[in-house]
Amino acid sequence: MPRSLKKGPFIDIKLEKRILDMNSRSEKKVLKTWSRSTMISPDFVGHTIAVHNGKTHVPVYVSDNMVGHKLGEFAPTRTFRGHAGGKAEKGGSAPKRK
């Protein structure tokens, strides 16, 4: 369920303050954040934000079409290592019956 319109988007206050401060100084550097639920605003465009995925910080370069999404959408938390490789590793299917 989406957030109520009367509440407005959630943006971490400290992160927004750091971004606006960097915009005023026209500075670009990587910002670390643990706030995956922060919605991306137009002020964030052009910055690289390192979003925590539970283990490391994943660098996310914010572009125009990311506005309105949340930071956590661009830092996957799970790694897919493949399914069990029983038959696929052997290179063939089961032998045919006669």
Swiss-Prot record:
<protein>
    <recommendedName>
        <fullName>Small ribosomal subunit protein uS19</fullName>
    </recommendedName>
</protein>
<dbReference type="InterPro" id="IPR023575">
    <property type="entry name" value="Ribosomal_uS19_SF"/>
</dbReference>
<keyword id="KW-0689">Ribosomal protein</keyword>
<dbReference type="GO" id="GO:0005737">
    <property type="term" value="C:cytoplasm"/>
</dbReference>
<feature type="region of interest" description="Disordered">
    <location>
        <begin position="77"/>
        <end position="98"/>
    </location>
</feature>
<dbReference type="GO" id="GO:0000028">
    <property type="term" value="P:ribosomal small subunit assembly"/>
</dbReference>
<dbReference type="GO" id="GO:0015935">
    <property type="term" value="C:small ribosomal subunit"/>
</dbReference>
<comment type="similarity">
    <text>Belongs to the universal ribosomal protein uS19 family.</text>
</comment>
<comment type="function">
    <text>Protein S19 forms a complex with S13 that binds strongly to the 16S ribosomal RNA.</text>
</comment>
<dbReference type="GO" id="GO:0006412">
    <property type="term" value="P:translation"/>
</dbReference>
<keyword id="KW-0699">rRNA-binding</keyword>
<dbReference type="Pfam" id="PF00203">
    <property type="entry name" value="Ribosomal_S19"/>
</dbReference>
<dbReference type="GO" id="GO:0019843">
    <property type="term" value="F:rRNA binding"/>
</dbReference>
<dbReference type="InterPro" id="IPR002222">
    <property type="entry name" value="Ribosomal_uS19"/>
</dbReference>
<keyword id="KW-0687">Ribonucleoprotein</keyword>
<dbReference type="InterPro" id="IPR020934">
    <property type="entry name" value="Ribosomal_uS19_CS"/>
</dbReference>
<dbReference type="InterPro" id="IPR005732">
    <property type="entry name" value="Ribosomal_uS19_bac-type"/>
</dbReference>
<dbReference type="GO" id="GO:0003735">
    <property type="term" value="F:structural constituent of ribosome"/>
</dbReference>
<keyword id="KW-0694">RNA-binding</keyword>
